[in-house]
Amino acid sequence: MSHSKSSQRWLKEHFSDPFVKKAQAEGMRSRAAYKLEEILKRDRILRPNMVVIDLGAAPGGWSQQIRKQMGDRGRVIALDIVKMAPLVGIEFLQGDFRDKAVLSQLEIMLKGQPVDLVLSDMAPNKSGMDAMDQPRMMYLAELAMDFADIHVKPGGSFLIKLFHGVGSDDYIRQLRHRYKKVAIRKPLASRKRSPEVYILGDGKLTQNEVSCS
């Protein structure tokens, strides 16, 4: 199939997608907001007054959904390398969270508040070649897990998107040593042919609990 025909097929599918239509109607930045909505309703990990950090947040669909669910209580801090247009009730920090200066700025923003939930919907720009895309995805996932190790408070939660493939099973095993409950989710808004799955770690273990597990 030619590149133009493939692009036309994608565009047709995209604009006929009910979740795309719903996002447009409700003012959501992306259809990904409804993937998160389903997980939040099923697993009930969100409570009022939580502090939530959204990694790789642009264009902001997940941050919007968190703010919608929490109302005007709690804090949502969105973090991304690329610029994100402002959203009401969302604090945005632009930069690479591997950068010490960015992490220092985040600490200033947090003002000592513990983090209840870290989200990561990050994914690499896809080349279409699994041999390249999967390692890149797993690298981002490792960075997000390291970030959550440092920032999520004991008892807190971590939700991340993975591509099912090489390294994903081992990654899930690592999470089982860090959280009391680990669940794999494939929301209805996630296209069936997509390799993406969402992994939820709930009830972060303390260092003593990790040592004993």
From Swiss-Prot:
Domain of life: Bacteria
GO MF, any single term: rRNA (uridine-2'-O-)-methyltransferase activity
UniProt main location, coarse: cytoplasm
Pfam families, A to Z: FtsJ
Active site feature: K161
Subcellular location: Cytoplasm
EC nos: 2.1.1.166
Catalysed reaction equations from the record: uridine(2552) in 23S rRNA + S-adenosyl-L-methionine = 2'-O-methyluridine(2552) in 23S rRNA + S-adenosyl-L-homocysteine + H(+)
SUPFAM superfamilies xref list: S-adenosyl-L-methionine-dependent methyltransferases
Binding site for S-adenosyl-L-methionine: G60, W62, D80, D96, D121
Cellular compartments per GO CC: cytoplasm
InterPro entries membership: RNA_methyltr_RlmE, RNA_MeTrfase_FtsJ_dom, rRNA-MeTfrase_E, SAM-dependent_MTases_sf
Keywords from the UniProt entry: Cytoplasm, Methyltransferase, rRNA processing, S-adenosyl-L-methionine, Transferase
Similarity comment text for this entry: Belongs to the class I-like SAM-binding methyltransferase superfamily. RNA methyltransferase RlmE family.
Protein's job: Specifically methylates the uridine in position 2552 of 23S rRNA at the 2'-O position of the ribose in the fully assembled 50S ribosomal subunit.
Protein name (database record): Ribosomal RNA large subunit methyltransferase E
Lineage: Bacteria, Pseudomonadati, Pseudomonadota, Gammaproteobacteria, Lysobacterales
